[in-house]
Regions:
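Phosphate-coordinating catalytic segments in nucleotide- and nucleic-acid-processing enzymes
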Residues: 5-7, 48-325, 394-429
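Switch/communication elements of ASCE P-loop NTPase nucleotide-binding domains
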Residues: 1-51, 290-427
């Protein structure tokens, strides 16, 4: 089992943090100490490392779509100034189909192929347009504006060829640059994919190998997916159809295949839920439904928020996304949970690490969650892979925090006991 160390320093509230990720890791500390910053930064870092080629393709396909946008303006001119009876010759339906394919595809090779086909269609279209239009001078003027050129045209055919050759070159250069970026893996490209995050003091190592150096970055080998969610924003994920997390809840993993041992946890979660979570069709799309064992059926977004917390884990497991090569990051998993259910949730997290091997990072400031994980991890024999970190204010700046690894949870509970002291203080006569 690979071991990971995640470090971040001098960033927002974080003075220094060096976090082991070799099992189940808990970040504890007061509000504003940087726990969520650590979680979100790790998510974005790991997402770039695990999905680098897909992210490069996504950016490049977006750039290709932007490069062909002027062709939509050409459509407007042609529809206005070329006789409508000629439009059937211009294969408008095929053109619209190609545009839609470019807009939807996430594959760079396909986007380049569709774009070059589209350009060829427009080359034919404009060549014929100049032959049939009665407004040739006006058409020339409009096209020069669309393509932002002041070039004097020796003839219409040369102008059309020049414009589309330049567009073809632009498409090919976008694809060529993307392919080279995949090979080079330069630090600058990495920085571009993590906007608004200072990575100068950021590092992740895998089995002792640092993945970021001065000029390049290396691949993660044994982490293939990262999943991150904030429990206090549970309801938002059910409506965000563009997010990765939404797809994890609704779609089965392409590599879906569960071992017998991996089936045990979903069964345990069904027992806790008292039912199942299934997809259902509605007029405007789909939704998740909670089917209770006594026959009750309601949309999941109308269920208790605590039940939704467990439902998310159930869906991630059943859809095949929580594996030994997954990093799961959860902010404040105890949010919305009754103390009894906090203990159950802690047990699921410990068993998820023990039985499946998923690496887990959570942030928490709840004593029940911390104590439950500590006790259950010891009982299940995984305490050596359970790491507790506590954020302490820096000696030089009370607004900057150092995350220190704890041999036991005593220091964490000392911080929780401050609340009891305050209660006594404010409650005294």
């Amino acid at each position: 089992m690979s071991r990971y160390v995640y470090s971040l320093s001098d960033y927002r509230a974080i003075k220094k943090a060096e976090i082991a990720l070799d099992g189940l890791t808990i970040l504890a500390g007061e509000n504003g100490s940087g726990k969520s910053t650590l979680s979100e930064t790790l998510y974005r870092l790991t997402k770039v490392l695990t999905e680098y080629e897909q992210l490069i393709d996504k950016k490049a396909t977006g750039d290709i779509y932007s490069a062909i946008r002027p062709l939509q303006k050409v459509d407007m001119v042609l529809q206005r100034y070329v006789h409508r009876e000629q439009n059937s010759d211009f294969q408008i339906e095929e053109i619209l189909h190609l545009v839609e394919k470019i807009r939807e595809t996430k594959n760079l090779i396909s986007a380049e192929e569709y774009a070059l086909k589209l350009i060829e269609k427009y080359r034919e279209l404009l060549t014929k347009a100049f032959e049939v239009t009665r407004n040739k001078e006006f058409l020339r003027s409009r096209l020069m504006t669309i393509f932002e050129t002041e070039q004097e045209m020796s003839d219409d055919k040369s102008f059309v060829e020049n414009v589309f050759s330049k567009m073809e070159d632009e498409i090919e250069n976008i694809a060529k640059t993307a392919r080279q970026d995949k090979i080079d893996r330069k630090r600058k490209t990495f920085v571009d994919l993590m906007p608004r995050i200072d990575i100068s003091n950021l590092q992740l190592s895998e089995d002792g190998v640092e993945l970021l150096d001065q000029n390049h970055f290396n691949q993660l080998i044994n982490i293939k997916r990262v999943i991150y969610y904030k429990t206090y924003e549970l309801m938002d994920y059910l409506g965000d159809k563009l997010s990765d997390f939404y797809s994890y809840l609704f779609e089965t993993s392409p590599e879906y295949q569960m071992t017998q041992e991996e089936r045990l946890l979903p069964m345990r979660l069904r027992s806790i839920l008292g039912g199942t979570i299934d997809r259902g069709e509605i007029l405007w799309g789909e939704q998740l439904l909670y089917h209770r064992d006594d026959g009750l059926e309601i949309p999941l977004n109308q269920a208790a928020t605590g039940l939704i917390s467990f439902s998310y884990l159930a869906r991630l497991l059943e859809n095949g996304y929580l594996k030994k090569d997954t990093l799961l990051i959860i902010d404040e998993p105890e949010a919305h949970l009754h103390p009894k259910w906090i203990v159950e949730y802690a047990r699921i997290l410990v068993l998820l690490q023990k039985q499946i091997g998923t690496k887990i990072l959570i942030s928490s400031h709840n004593p029940d969650m911390v104590a439950a994980i500590d006790a259950i991890a010891r009982k299940e024999g995984v305490s050596e892979r359970t790491n507790f970190y506590f954020a302490k204010p820096s000696d030089t700046n009370k607004y900057k925090y150092i995350f220190e690894r704890q041999d036991n949870i005593g220091s964490i509970f000392d911080s929780f006991n401050i609340a009891l002291t305050r209660i006594e203080e404010y409650g005294e006569d």
